[in-house]
């Protein structure tokens, strides 16, 4: 998948959330550690990382590095995951400390075929708010 397709998908998610009362701006074109920034429907400052998966897993993976970088921001850190069974929104600041696992992952999902071991969290989907927007 090309980087342009990735950005189109991210912008579509942002647009759908904005229709539901969010006020987000896509910023995934640069070197930020998140894909959107803005406010929640209740006016909270937020940063949003967006991922989609072609396969369904009941545990949603996020790299520890990405998780930690999101929490460093002066805003609520959110993680949006879309997969064939639904759309999940994790409020990362509210999650209890998770255990890390080491997984053999792509170095960079879109631009290389290299793989290496990465520390990751596997977030149980029951910890997320399941959203009813349909993007497939």
Tell what function each PLM region has.
Residues 1-28:
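Acidic-basic catalytic patches of nuclease active cores, encompassing PD-(D/E)XK
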Residues 13, 66-69:
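A general structural detector for well-ordered alpha-helical segments in enzyme core domains, enriched
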Residues 17, 36-38, 42-56:
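Conserved catalytic cores of phosphodiester-cleaving nucleases, focusing on short active-site segments
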Residues 19, 39-42, 75, 83-136:
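Non-catalytic C-terminal interaction segments of nucleic acid-processing enzymes
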Residues 30-33, 86-87:
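Short acidic/glycine-enriched loop/turn segments that link adjacent beta-strands
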Residues 47, 79-81:
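Structural beta-sheet core signal
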Residues 54-67:
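Active-site-adjacent loop/helix micro-motif of nuclease/hydrolase catalytic cores
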Residues 70-74:
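Arginine/glycine-rich "motif VI" loop of SF2 helicases in the C-terminal RecA-like domain
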């Amino acid at each position: 998948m090309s980087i342009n397709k990735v950005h189109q998908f991210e912008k579509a998610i942002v647009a759908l959330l904005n229709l539901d009362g969010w006020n987000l701006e896509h910023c995934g074109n640069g070197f930020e550690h998140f894909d959107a920034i803005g406010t929640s429907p209740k006016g909270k400052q937020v940063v949003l990382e967006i991922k989609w998966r072609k396969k369904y897993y009941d545990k949603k993976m996020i790299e520890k590095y990405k998780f930690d970088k999101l929490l460093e921001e002066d805003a609520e850190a959110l993680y949006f995951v879309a997969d064939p069974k639904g759309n999940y929104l994790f409020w990362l600041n509210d999650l209890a400390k998770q255990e890390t696992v080491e997984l053999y992952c792509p170095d960079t999902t879109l631009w290389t075929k290299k793989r290496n071991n990465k520390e990751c969290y596997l977030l149980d989907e029951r910890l997320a708010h399941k959203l009813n927007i349909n993007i497939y």
